[in-house]
From Swiss-Prot:
Function according to Swiss-Prot or TrEMBL: Catalyzes the first step of the osmoprotectant glycine betaine synthesis.
Organism: Arabidopsis thaliana (Mouse-ear cress)
Binding-site positions, Fe cation: H269, H274
Pathway: Amine and polyamine biosynthesis; betaine biosynthesis via choline pathway; betaine aldehyde from choline (monooxygenase route): step 1/1
Keyword hit for Transit peptide: yes
Ranges where the Rieske domain occurs: 96-203
InterPro entries assigned to the protein according to its UniProt record, in alphabetical order: Rieske_2Fe-2S, Rieske_2Fe-2S_sf, Ring_hydroxy_dOase_asu_C_dom, Rng_hydr_dOase-A
Pfam short name (any one): Rieske
Disulfide links within the chain: none
Lineage, highest ranks first: Eukaryota, Viridiplantae, Streptophyta, Embryophyta, Tracheophyta
Catalytic activity: choline + 2 reduced [2Fe-2S]-[ferredoxin] + O2 + 2 H(+) = betaine aldehyde hydrate + 2 oxidized [2Fe-2S]-[ferredoxin] + H2O
The protein, known as: Choline monooxygenase, chloroplastic
Family, similarity comment: Belongs to the choline monooxygenase family.
Transit peptide location: 1-47
Amino acid sequence: MMTTLTATVPEFLPPSLKSTRGYFNSHSEFGVSISKFSRRRFHNPTRVFAVSDISKLVTEFDPKIPLERASTPPSSWYTDPQFYSFELDRVFYGGWQAVGYSDQIKESRDFFTGRLGDVDFVVCRDENGKIHAFHNVCSHHASILASGNGRKSCFVCLYHGWTYSLSGSLVKATRMSGIQNFSLSEMGLKPLRVAVWGPFVLLKVTAATSRKGEVETDELVASEWLGTSVGRLSQGGVDSPLSYICRREYTIDCNWKVFCDNYLDGGYHVPYAHKGLMSGLDLETYSTTIFEKVSIQECGGGSKVGEDGFDRLGSEALYAFVYPNFMINRYGPWMDTNLVLPLGPRKCKVVFDYFLDPSLKDDEAFIKRSLEESDRVQMEDVMLCESVQRGLESQAYDKGRYALVEKPMHHFHCLLHHNLKL
């Protein structure tokens, strides 16, 4: 029998999910009186939003209505370009985001780059072993500074040769002799807050507390990013030593939230859309636990073990969603993570990274077969998500309803509303 468990959740949620106060930032910097202003600039100073229009879209979903009587957010949340731009500022730039893995910066001078919304970043480990994160933008004329990943002793801009140390300081500015009121010390890279928890490297787009930035403590990250779910995730082996295997990327013609919704339907779609996966799971054991900004779905393994003994799912599976766009899947000897990156109101990229028990890291046949099965499931989800996006564009659809098993999805929408409300 399917069960739903409820752990600690924020005060603003409806009664069926209601619990503690004070977990979220107040975002007071976004405060605005709609009666006094028709427009207001938010986090990104280059972007202006019509407050009245955004406010109307946000209030079309009411988080105080319990799931049993609630409607889903309107289709405009998934299609409107203005809503999408506002969403980037309010949802993605205020909290921790998992953007990479500690193995990517294992040694001094290692670095990797990425993009979150319209923010390009670079993460590196300097010569003294300290981890830094910066906006990946040259201070001279805004060229993107680094690309890809690898190892460098410094960052040299390909445009005009300005050179930065791995600690972000500008150490060389070409052809600046004679320029007045210019100081190398004032033109370093703009820092970002960076943290490491288990195998994950996390960023906050909000400005670092000091010019050089600081690596946050494990305790702070656990509190802000994972809340009270950290114990259950550790128990499930999420932070255990695993070997990194590979990365797969899927570009999908759907809003980023469509992919998240699909993940958060409590296994509802599995019997209908994933016949192969279903045979390896015992859906009668499916359960859901809701935390502050995390929901965990768990399911026992089924009877699918090949005649050759092949079994990638094991005896139980744990699927954790970390708001707003990160999934951690722990099953058998495997862990894979899914980072959902918005590319526009109707497009996203999902980055899958695969980790494996070290005892199996050299078993090429097992790895190949496991990845093939995983890819089959992902392509089934791609088809579903793109189909949903087309339906959301239809004049025939505006809002839907929740099934009882879709509590994680409803929780996700309540969290979105909390970040988006004016």
